[in-house]
């Protein structure tokens, strides 16, 4: 599917935090790009090889809560398990009573010598300035993380 999204993601200026805007032709693609943007804040995701896979499932009543839980779960994967995911991410989003993401992230254990370090450590996800909207033919997921 082709659309006129401006990029996969971009960062914005924000004091002591980082504002992230992730884009996608579909909500699934936007959630995937939100995960890649999060990774690229700390390490270089293009250096990650798909040596193992991690399943992630999150659900919430609304899309904003789902985005919060998605990013929060990914932070846990990196902080607690030292799992570095690359750009190969499969995301399935389902809507029923609420919303549910079932995803598979391909990656490997984080190695600073291989994956590098950008100098930023993401501490937490916030609800500050969170926004999810459809613009023309693409989706925008905006969120802020504490660094």
Swiss-Prot record:
GO terms for molecular function: calcium ion binding. One of its GO terms (biological process) is tRNA splicing, via endonucleolytic cleavage and ligation. It holds the Pfam family Archease. The keyword Hydrolase does not apply. Keywords: Calcium, Metal-binding, tRNA processing. PANTHER family: ARCHEASE (PTHR12682), PROTEIN ARCHEASE (PTHR12682:SF11). Activates the tRNA-splicing ligase complex by facilitating the enzymatic turnover of catalytic subunit RtcB. Acts by promoting the guanylylation of RtcB, a key intermediate step in tRNA ligation. Can also alter the NTP specificity of RtcB such that ATP, dGTP or ITP is used efficiently. This is Protein archease. It comes from Pyrobaculum calidifontis (strain DSM 21063 / JCM 11548 / VA1).
């Amino acid at each position: 599917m082709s659309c006129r999204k401006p990029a996969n993601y971009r960062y914005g200026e924000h004091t002591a935090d980082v504002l992230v805007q992730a884009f996608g032709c579909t909500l699934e693609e936007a959630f995937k790009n939100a995960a890649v943007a999060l990774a690229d804040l700390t390490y270089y995701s293009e250096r990650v090889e798909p040596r193992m896979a991690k399943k992630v499932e999150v659900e919430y009543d609304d899309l904003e809560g789902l985005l919060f839980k998605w990013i929060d779960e990914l932070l846990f994967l990196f902080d607690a398990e030292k799992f570095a995911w690359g750009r190969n991410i499969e995301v399935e989003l389902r809507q029923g009573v609420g919303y549910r993401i079932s995803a598979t992230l391909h990656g490997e254990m984080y190695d600073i010598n291989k994956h590098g370090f950008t100098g930023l450590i993401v501490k937490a996800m916030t609800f500050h300035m969170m926004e999810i909207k459809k613009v023309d033919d693409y989706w925008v997921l905006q969120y802020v993380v504490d660094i």
